Amino acid sequence: MRATLEAGGKEARAQLPLLLACSFAASFAQSMMNIALPQVADEFGVTLSTANWLVTGYMVVAATSIALAAFLLRRLGLRTVFFIGCGALALGSGLALFAPNFWVLLAGRLVQAVCTGLFYSAVTSFIMANSDPARRGTHLALNSGTVAAGLAVSPVVSGLVLTGFGRHALFALPLALAVLLLAVGFFRLREVGPRGTGAVDPLSVVLGLGALVYGLGEVFRDPLPSLAVLAAGVAVLGLFAWRQLVLKDPLLNLRPLGNLGFAVGELLVMLGMMASFSLSILLPLYYEGALGFSAFLAGALLAGPVLANALSDVVGGRLLDRWGIWPLVPCGFALTALGLAVVALAAGRPLLALVVLASAVAYVGLGLVVAPSKTTALSQLPPSLYAHASSINSAFIQIASAIGSSLFVGVLSADVLAGTSRGLARAAAYDAGFAHTMEIAIGIAAASLLVSLAYAYRLRRRRG
């Protein structure tokens, strides 16, 4: 009989802290390079959009790993997946630690990303399978809080290490985390639940979003070749979706997307995550490139707004239970648009305190959007589709983050190159590029507000 996390399930309950530590390591590794892009670009003589592959490439691989995690858990079990994830984090961190050039550094980041994709999916699956239904929401919220803590702590700690000890030392942190997790997991982690059967489709693993993300990142700098790559990426993405629909045992079951309520809810989640992860990259670029701050100070200025986002996630869940999606999610997008608009105005002055405060407002708005939109989207489906829909949501979050950061950093990189070629000082070019990207982000937030108003109003009318 399968153990649960409640009374009588001591073995499963004892493993939860270890798995939460895995979630922390996964989120820490994911966001650790957000504050390092300017330094990496300068060190290796590459553009910002190229350096941003350390972030976008990571998210593409993580999205693929999320889709693959369900198969690996079913065939190999939790303990084996844990060791694969920790091994990927250790190997990728070791490669990046001693990387002599940008491409070895990128390879290390892509290997690291396997850890994030596997752990995000594995920990959620463990909680869903081994929690008493009355406590499942609490355990999932605890996991979400752990992930948010990693996202908030990573820029500060990484910035401190990067400023004080340099780029190589930055990867000693996730390497140490991986070694510690491997040691504890070897003695403490036990298999929970039976293994299943099934096969994975290799072509589905190969088909990915790389061409699409690359095209978005470079299209403003080199339009014609990038548009061709972008078109190829869209075609490959379409082929991936078609293959999942025709396979008997798909890598990622896309059938829940046939439900319009779920599909629109996921669209709102993706739009929110594009804004959230783009802010977490664009703000450090502004602080370091336009204002000349150190990586540590840039990370410290980002920590408060990210923590505000984590707290608003919890508040948003409670407000959703009480009021539903109306008017919560539209208000969240309105706050986001307002915060981004004030950031753009204050950054041009520059008024640092107002930039930080306004970015916190935008992050709070996003906290009222993402989790409620996800919960509402899932509620449109029958319980038999929850597992597939959760995998879609996790993969879409990584995809949206990759597309958003690639688009915005691509625009900023093109503006910086164009500005410096016209004789602008580097800081002035960063400032102008940041203002341009904020205009695009505000437009996306405003369009999202309109979509959320129509979606929330439709659901409200359906309830009568």
Locations of regions flagged by a protein language model:
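Hydrophobic transmembrane-helix bundles of small-molecule transporters
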Residues: 159, 163-268
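Membrane-embedded alpha-helical segments in integral membrane proteins
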Residues: 30, 34-38, 91-97, 147-163, ...
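Short, Lys/Arg-rich, polar N-terminal cytosolic tail immediately upstream
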Residues: 1-9
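Short, charged juxtamembrane terminal tails flanking transmembrane helices
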Residues: 3, 461-464
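Membrane-embedded alpha-helical core segments of multi-pass
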Residues: 65, 118-119, 144, 150-154, ...
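12-transmembrane solute porter fold
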Residues: 11-28, 33-37, 44-92, 104, ...
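Transmembrane alpha-helical segments of integral membrane proteins
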Residues: 185, 417-422
